[in-house]
């Protein structure tokens, strides 16, 4: 009984004292995590790392070599697609003709292209 009680406080004290004394361990761990996230954040690296996880969902798409087209449609549909739909829905009730004649139609293509190139916040979702 006495031995168990003596052993319990020792690990707790050591655990509390270790992270408190060597402050370099905390930053080192955070630094090790940051480079990994930063490396996956860029569009180029994310695009190269995206294919491995999805093959289980759709292997024929990757085998056919249509990985690029799959990324483009998913970007606008998830990211810019919602924004464009929201604006169209707001304008449609008023006048659908004025929406098309206005700047809604020409604004859709550039937003979709910029969304895919601007690295949408879907990188963490694929992880």
UniProtKB/Swiss-Prot annotation:
Segments of this protein annotated with the region Disordered: 43-127
Domain of life: Eukaryota
One Gene Ontology cellular component annotation held by this UniProt entry: extracellular region
Signal sequence, renumbered to the chain: 1-23
Localization in the cell: Secreted
Keywords from the named record: Secreted, Signal
Record's compositionally biased regions (Low complexity): 59-70
Record-given protein name: Putative uncharacterized protein UNQ6190/PRO20217
Provenance organism: Homo sapiens (Human)
């Amino acid at each position: 009984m006495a031995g168990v009680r003596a052993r319990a406080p020792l690990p707790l004290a050591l655990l509390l004292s270790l992270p408190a004394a060597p402050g370099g361990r905390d930053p080192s761990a955070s630094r090790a995590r940051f480079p990994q996230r930063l490396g996956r954040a860029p569009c180029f690296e994310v695009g190269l790392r995206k294919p491995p996880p999805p093959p289980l969902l759709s292997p024929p798409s990757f085998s056919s070599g249509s990985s690029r087209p799959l990324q483009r449609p998913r970007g606008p549909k998830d990211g810019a697609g919602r924004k464009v739909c929201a604006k169209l829905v707001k304008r449609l009730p008023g006048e659908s003709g004025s929406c098309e004649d206005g700047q809604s139609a020409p604004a859709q293509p550039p937003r979709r292209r910029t969304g895919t190139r601007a690295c949408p916040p879907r990188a963490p979702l694929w992880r």
